[in-house]
Design a protein with these regions (language model features):
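Conserved, well-structured interaction surfaces
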Residues: 37, 43-51, 57-68, 89-170, ...
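An aromatic- and glycine-enriched ligand-binding surface/loop that stacks and positions planar moieties
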Residues: 22-93, 240-429
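Long, intrinsically disordered, low-complexity segments
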Residues: 20-22, 123, 198, 276-358, ...
Length: 609
């Protein structure tokens, strides 16, 4: 081959003088095959699959913290923003942030805030990856139409998902329907309703092209696409005032539910009574007698449909230690470190301090290592996490008051009260309450979705040298479960005037959690639904998109404002630094986006200076 190329070059040099200057110029233009462009990047179907895989990785960063940068949380990780940082459910840990730096100190926010730009960029990057995969699918040959249709449907799912989140969070946004590699400065904002229509079209096509169930764990299928289609229908119904979209949402939600029934019985690891009396790693019991179906959903080894979990719609597959090591050409503990909740920031009032036990626990405290392997660095204490995030009183206390207390989701197996862990303290083993602490705002219950209630299931390789297991390492994360689909169904039915059916959908989720309180039709409203979403989906759902889609663009989002006024950390929970509810109903368009768009006007959202 090399000899042939040289011969061709000699011939070209000999005849070159016969060509005009134009031909000379054409001859000088190079087309090196080692430089990939959109025109030559795709030559076989596996490259399209690789591009689709890239969209999954981009989506992963919208649900979990993956880069191991503990300070990335406060420089604006898109995942933490979407998951509700600064909303009614989650805020920065009070030991780290203060009223001045907290997102829920809404008076301090402006369009320069890095969270808005990082979220904007991440969502548009995901859309670009999806558009490139769709483009590439038409450039190659396929072994079958089914193979092509499946991958294109996955790409359309991600294209729709990215614009669904953009429209929910920012309202009207520039809509780029096809892959574009040209640098532009003249984008205009497409009306929110038109963006939602684009989302719906692509999700409907994704539903048609996807299989009932994914061939590989972590991939999306009909259930996930129909779930987000139901959400898009609801959003469009709110935006346009056309109630027919709520009927469509009901149909889409039911399509998902028929494929993915709730897990109503105990299942998987730690659920077999025959394992009672046996222990696993670190001598921790294999059987959790106090578990429940809800508890089982969040155990390592129980997340995927292939593991027996019919409720699972879409799972973010977190690499194991060995997979991380292979990808990084060496051993690595790098994983999710930002969000696990630590005990270590609790500080006694003077009357509770004792000579040999100065705190609820301390690094030097004498702890029962059989009960708490790794001591203060164990998973129940935050593991290797810096505890960047903390739960608000709303999801720790408010939603469990009165008749709502009896609930598997409120049990000590899944939502754990801090206890005195220092064996030298006279209150060893007792539950800590806020009135014992110098800074009650640091108090939080520990979610078993984030921390684990014990060290069962950790790979022994995943232990930070001299400390405990890296928080959440090797643990998968739900992007969607059919329990949330029931809550979308409840909202669609309520908005369509069918409160009886809405209560039925809510109660299906509550019955699974063995709740003593069930809803009547007269009790159902949007606040009821938001409360139930908090009980079922805390630390899981994209809370800000849920709140921001509750009003038509240009109108005041009263439900969101009331929710934040009542429950946001630095509006309600912190009595020393009370703030105010936001004046805006949508996130700010990032200032740099407006400034760089010199070829067309990019107006800012209402309520932002």
């Amino acid at each position: 081959m090399k000899k042939n190329i040289i011969n061709i070059l000699i011939i070209l040099c000999a005849v070159a003088p016969l060509f005009s200057c134009v031909k000379d110029q054409e001859f000088l233009e190079e087309a090196p095959k080692t430089i990939y462009t959109v025109d030559n990047a795709f030559s076989k179907s596996s490259q399209v699959d690789a591009q689709v895989a890239r969209t999954y990785y981009a989506a992963y960063s919208l649900y979990v913290w993956i880069d191991g940068n503990i300070f990335g949380a406060f420089s604006g990780s898109p995942s933490s923003t979407l998951l509700g940082y600064g909303s009614d459910v989650i805020e920065g840990n009070a030991a780290i942030v203060n009223a001045g730096s907290a997102f829920s100190h809404f008076d301090n926010l402006d369009p320069l805030n890095g969270r808005f730009l990082s979220l904007w960029n991440a969502l548009y990057q995901l859309a670009s990856y999806a558009n490139l995969a769709i483009y590439g699918a038409d450039q190659v040959s396929w072994s079958s139409d089914a193979e092509k249709n499946d991958l294109v449907a996955q790409a359309k799912f991600f294209l729709a998902f990215s614009y669904l989140r953009l429209a929910e969070c920012f309202g009207s946004v520039p809509l780029v329907e096809e892959f574009n590699q040209e640098l532009r400065y003249d984008y205009v904002r497409t009306p929110r309703s038109e963006v939602y229509a684009f989302v719906i079209k692509n999700l409907e096509e994704a539903v048609a092209g996807l299989p009932n169930y994914p061939a590989q764990d972590g991939r999306v299928a009909k259930g996930a696409a129909s779930h987000f289609l139901a959400e898009a229908y609801i959003a469009q119904g709110i935006e346009t005032g056309d109630k027919s979209y709520f009927n469509k949402a009901v149909s889409a939600a039911n399509a998902t539910i028929s494929l993915h029934p709730l897990m109503t019985e105990r299942f998987g690891v730690r659920a077999n009574p025959a394992d009672k009396g046996t222990t696993g790693m670190f001598n921790i019991p294999n059987y959790r007698e106090d578990g429940s179906p809800f508890f089982d959903l969040f155990q390592i080894g129980n997340y995927d449909r292939s593991e027996g979990n019919t409720e699972s719609l879409w799972v973010m597959e977190t690499p194991t230690y060995d997979q991380q090591a292979a990808a990084n050409s060496g051993q690595s503990n790098n994983s999710i470190v930002g969000c696990a909740q630590p005990y270590r920031d609790l500080i006694w009032k003077d009357q509770y301090k004792e000579t040999k036990a100065p705190g609820p626990w301390a690094a030097a405290a004498r702890m029962d290592m059989a009960k708490y392997p790794f001591g203060s660095a164990g998973p129940y204490c935050g593991g290797g996490s810096w505890g960047m995030y903390g739960s608000n009183d709303y999801i720790d206390e408010y939603v469990w008051q009165g008749d709502f207390a009896t609930d598997d989701r409120n049990s000590q197996a899944i939502l754990i009260d801090p206890v005195v862990m220092d064996m030298d303290h006279s209150m060893y083993g007792q539950v800590i309450s806020k009135d014992m602490l110098t800074e009650p705002a640091r108090y939080m219950r520990v979610s078993g979705k984030v921390n684990l209630p014990d060290a069962w299931g950790f790979d022994s390789h995943c232990i930070i040298m001299g400390q405990g297991p890296q928080a959440m390492f090797g643990r998968d994360v739900y992007a969607a479960r059919s329990a949330e689909t029931y809550l979308l169904l409840a909202e669609a039915q309520w908005r369509n005037g069918n409160s009886d059916e809405a209560a039925k959908a809510l109660n299906t989720v509550r019955v699974r959690a063995h709740c003593s309180k069930l809803f009547s039709a007269s009790e159902v409203n949007m606040v009821t639904i938001l409360d139930e979403r908090a009980r079922e989906l805390s630390w899981e759902e994209h809370r800000w998109p849920t709140l921001l889609r509750l009003a038509k663009e240009g109108e005041t989002n009263t439900v969101m404002h009331d929710q934040l006024r009542a429950h946001a950390q630095y509006v309600n929970d912190n009595p020393v630094y009370p703030g105010t509810a936001p004046k805006w109903s949508l996130f700010a368009i990032p200032l740099s986006v407006i400034q760089l768009n010199t070829g067309a006007e990019m107006p800012q959202n209402d309520g932002w200076k």
